[in-house]
């Protein structure tokens, strides 16, 4: 790897880390934000819906915004969001989560599009960085709050300073990325005489021409999106639906007794509260994500639907454990959660590697940003379903004389 390639890899690793670490910390803090009585999917919903909305809308407007302007927007929204999350008021917390979510979704689209300019080395760095965000965010939150007993508010405020690392974007060697991207302007008009390229900046035209241009731009964008649905979006959505149902709806109920004679001798020493179990699951999940996103390019899986099927099997196993209490030791569940994260990370990196390999170069930048809608949509569906699934599992456990899901 040349010095230039190494530098690009490191920068995109850092961008992936910072863009995702706040998302991870917020999900790790879900049990501290809403407590044991409210479903953790409430935090997931606030953490994913704004991100999904910005991703759904971005193909229609993002080409007008310079990358430098996007970076400053990311820093502002992320810092403000984490500052608000540190408040104890639930409404203010959820508002802060929404700001951080918008930043995360907008950042993912932005940096995935930037990989179009810096090729696979940048995607490898980005994917590894997003995986690193998981393990660093999850593990640091676990160590700070569960082992070192740092107050949750102070921990969240410390994380609010991290987005300033996005300023390293301005250290990237110029590759015309300060301009708005031009892929929408590269449509071959010979293929469709009626297509009118959407302008990067508005010019003085009459209202009817502008309206016609906008309508044609929207129709063309929808046409380009439709082609990406089944090869990339459906399997990625399915994987994320299954894994986030596990993480935010089932995992909070995968508990074991930590007090008295019922406590297993094999229980980790730092399991003092039931929230410690949940936070540990999150860390193990993120460890699996980190490993697969870092080395997924070495273990290529081009059939994305296989990964979706395997993740569905994991969901079934965890629901059975929650309902029937099959194993009384946490270690088997902890290994399964790690494996679940590994599959999720593998699905993510292989999806975008497939795009780089299979899509036309003129369409790659658009496809990279557009397909990022899929993972957020899967998480959004999981959040909605989880609002009902976690309470149902918890009620069954209480009736089965396992009231741990309502205990701190």
UniProtKB/Swiss-Prot annotation:
The keyword Signal applies. Residues 1-30 form the signal peptide. SUPFAM superfamilies: MFS general substrate transporter (SSF103473). The chain crosses the membrane at residues 42-62, 80-100, 128-148, 150-170, 238-258, 323-343, 369-389. It comes from the Eukaryota. It holds the Pfam family CLN3. It is a multi-pass membrane protein. It is found in: Vacuole membrane. GO terms for cellular component: fungal-type vacuole; vacuolar membrane; vacuole. GO terms for biological process: L-arginine transmembrane transport; lysine transport; regulation of intracellular pH. InterPro entries: Battenin_disease_Cln3, Battenin_disease_Cln3_subgr, MFS_trans_sf. Keywords: Amino-acid transport, Membrane, Signal, Transmembrane, Transmembrane helix, Transport, Vacuole. Plays a role in vacuolar arginine transport. Involved in pH homeostasis. May be involved in ion homeostasis together with IST2. Not necessary for mitochondrial function or ATP synthase degradation. Belongs to the battenin family. This is Protein BTN1. It comes from Saccharomyces cerevisiae (strain ATCC 204508 / S288c).
């Amino acid at each position: 790897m040349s010095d230039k390639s190494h530098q690009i890899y490191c920068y995109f690793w850092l961008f992936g880390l910072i863009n995702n670490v706040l998302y991870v910390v917020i999900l790790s803090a879900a049990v501290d934000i809403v407590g044991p009585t409210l479903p953790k999917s409430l935090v997931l919903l606030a953490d994913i819906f704004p991100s999904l909305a910005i991703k759904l809308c971005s193909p229609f407007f993002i080409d007008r915004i310079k990358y430098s302007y996007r970076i400053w927007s990311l820093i502002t929204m992320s810092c403000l969001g984490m500052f608000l999350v540190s408040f104890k008021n639930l409404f203010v917390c959820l508002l802060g989560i929404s700001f951080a979510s918008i930043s995360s979704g907008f950042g993912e689209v932005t940096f995935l599009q930037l990989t179009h300019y810096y090729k696979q080395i940048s995607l490898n760095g980005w994917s590894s960085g997003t995986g690193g965000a998981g393990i660093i965010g999850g593990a640091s939150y676990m160590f700070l709050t569960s082992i070192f007993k740092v107050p949750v508010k102070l921990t969240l405020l410390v994380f609010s300073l991290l987005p300033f690392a996005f300023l390293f974007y301005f250290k990237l060697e110029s590759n015309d990325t300060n301009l708005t991207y031009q892929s929408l302007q590269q449509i071959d008009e010979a293929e469709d005489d009626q297509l009118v390229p959407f302008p990067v900046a508005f010019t003085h035209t009459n209202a009817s021409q502008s309206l016609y241009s906008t309508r044609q731009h929207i129709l063309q964008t929808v046409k380009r999106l439709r082609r990406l649905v089944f090869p990339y979006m459906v399997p990625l959505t399915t994987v994320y639906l299954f894994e986030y149902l596990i993480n935010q709806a089932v995992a909070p109920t995968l508990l074991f007794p930590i007090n008295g004679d019922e406590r297993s001798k094999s229980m980790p020493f730092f399991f003092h509260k039931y929230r410690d179990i949940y936070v540990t699951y999150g860390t193990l999940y993120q460890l699996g994500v980190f490993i697969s996103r870092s080395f997924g390019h070495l273990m290529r899986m081009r059939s994305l639907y296989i990964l979706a099927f395997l993740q569905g099997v994991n969901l079934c196993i965890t629901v059975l454990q929650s309902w029937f209490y099959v194993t009384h030791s946490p270690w088997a569940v902890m290994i399964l959660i790690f494996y679940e994260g590994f599959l999720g990370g593998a699905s993510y990196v292989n999806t975008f590697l497939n795009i780089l390999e299979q899509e036309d170069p003129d369409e790659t930048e658009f496809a990279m940003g557009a397909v990022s809608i899929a993972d957020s949509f899967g998480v959004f569906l999981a959040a909605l379903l989880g609002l009902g699934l976690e309470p149902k599992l918890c009620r069954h456990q209480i009736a089965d004389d396992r009231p741990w899901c309502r205990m701190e």
